C-alpha cells in the first residue's frame, strides 16, 4: 500500500489549505493517481485496522441497488447513518444510479448488468463505463457521489478497473474506496471468467481534513505489513449472487485502529 502512504505524505508536505463544505478545512492537492496490481495481494491498508464488514456490506448494498440504510443497519454497518433521513433514505445515490439510471422514456438502465454483459461479449470495448454522477438528480441525493465514474479494461485475460473520484477524504474514505473497487474488480472478473488485473485510482480533490493531520502522521510512522489475500467462493459466477459469506479476506494483520471524526 505504498502508493497510498505516498499520497498521504505528499498532501502533508505539499497540500494547500482550503475551506470546504463541512467547515472543517483541508490540506488539498488536485489530480493524483495510484496503481495497484491485484495479483500482488489485496490492497487493504495495513498501517491501521479497517472495518472489513463495512467495506463488504456497503459494496453488496450498492450492487442490490439499495438506497435505504436498513440493510446496512441490519448488518451492523453505520457508515451512512449521518446522511440518512428519518426513514433511513438517502435519495438516488450510488445503488440507484448503478442499477436503475432513469431514462427519458420512463424506463431504467441497469449499468452493472450492462457492463458485465459487454465485458463478456465485447471485451475490447472502450465503453465499459459505469457512472454514478447524474447531474439531473445530484440535488436529490443526501451526498453527491464522491467516487463518480469507473471504467473496466480487458487485456490478456485480465480485468482492470479505473475509478475517477472527484472528492477524496484520504484518511477515512480512500482506504475504503480502494478496497471496495478492488473487491468489485475481483467479483466482476470471476463472473466474466477473467483474472483480476490492476486497480487504478484517479483522484480529483485529494484532501486531508485538518482534524486528521495528527492521525495521518501517526499512520505514516508505522511500518507497512504484508498485504492480505482475497478469497471468493469459486462457485459464484453471477456478480449479483455474491453474499457476505462468499467473500473472505485472509492473513490481514494490521496495526491498531486510529480513531478520527467524519466530516459531515
From Swiss-Prot:
Keywords: Cytoplasm, Methyltransferase, Nucleotide biosynthesis, Transferase. Pfam families: Thymidylat_synt (PF00303). It is found in: Cytoplasm. GO terms for biological process: dTMP biosynthetic process; dTTP biosynthetic process; methylation. It catalyses: dUMP + (6R)-5,10-methylene-5,6,7,8-tetrahydrofolate = 7,8-dihydrofolate + dTMP. GO terms for molecular function: thymidylate synthase activity. PROSITE patterns: THYMIDYLATE_SYNTHASE (PS00091). Its EC number is 2.1.1.45. (6R)-5,10-methylene-5,6,7,8-tetrahydrofolate binds at residues 51, 169, 263. One of its GO terms (cellular component) is cytosol. It is an enzyme of class 2 (transferase). It comes from the Bacteria. Its main location: cytoplasm. Pathway: Pyrimidine metabolism; dTTP biosynthesis. PANTHER family: THYMIDYLATE SYNTHASE, THYMIDYLATE SYNTHASE 1. Homodimer. Belongs to the thymidylate synthase family. Bacterial-type ThyA subfamily. This is Thymidylate synthase. It comes from Chromohalobacter salexigens (strain ATCC BAA-138 / DSM 3043 / CIP 106854 / NCIMB 13768 / 1H11). The gene is thyA.
Amino acid at each position: 500500500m505504498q502508493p497510498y502512504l505516498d499520497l498521504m505524505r505528499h498532501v502533508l508536505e505539499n497540500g494547500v489549505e482550503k475551506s470546504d463544505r463541512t467547515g472543517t478545512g483541508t490540506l488539498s492537492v488536485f489530480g493524483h493517481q495510484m496503481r495497484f496490481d491485484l495479483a500482488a495481494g489485496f490492497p487493504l491498508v495495513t498501517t491501521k485496522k479497517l472495518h472489513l464488514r463495512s467495506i463488504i456490506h456497503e459494496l453488496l448494498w450498492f450492487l442490490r441497488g439499495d438506497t435505504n440504510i436498513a440493510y446496512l443497519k441490519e448488518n451492523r454497518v453505520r457508515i451512512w447513518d449521518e446522511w440518512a433521513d428519518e426513514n433511513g433514505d438517502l435519495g438516488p445515490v450510488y445503488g440507484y444510479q448503478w442499477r436503475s439510471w432513469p431514462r427519458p422514456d420512463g424506463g431504467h438502465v441497469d449499468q452493472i448488468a450492462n457492463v458485465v454483459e459487454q465485458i463478456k461479449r465485447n471485451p475490447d470495448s472502450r465503453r465499459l463505463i459505469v457512472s454514478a454522477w447524474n447531474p439531473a438528480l445530484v440535488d436529490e441525493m443526501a451526498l453527491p457521489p464522491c467516487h463518480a465514474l469507473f471504467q473496466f479494461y480487458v487485456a490478456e485475460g485480465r480485468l482492470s478497473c479505473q475509478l475517477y473520484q472527484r472528492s477524496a477524504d484520504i484518511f477515512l474514505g480512500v482506504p475504503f474506496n480502494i478496497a471496495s473497487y478492488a473487491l468489485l474488480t475481483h467479483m466482476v472478473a470471476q463472473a466474466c471468467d477473467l483474472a483480476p488485473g490492476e486497480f487504478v485510482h484517479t483522484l480529483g480533490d485529494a484532501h486531508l481534513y485538518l482534524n486528521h493531520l495528527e492521525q495521518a502522521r501517526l499512520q505514516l510512522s508505522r511500518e507497512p505489513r504484508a498485504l492480505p489475500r482475497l478469497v471468493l467462493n469459486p462457485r459464484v459466477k453471477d456478480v449479483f449472487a455474491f453474499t457476505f459469506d462468499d467473500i473472505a479476506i485472509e492473513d490481514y494483520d494490521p496495526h491498531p485502529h486510529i480513531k478520527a471524526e467524519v466530516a459531515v
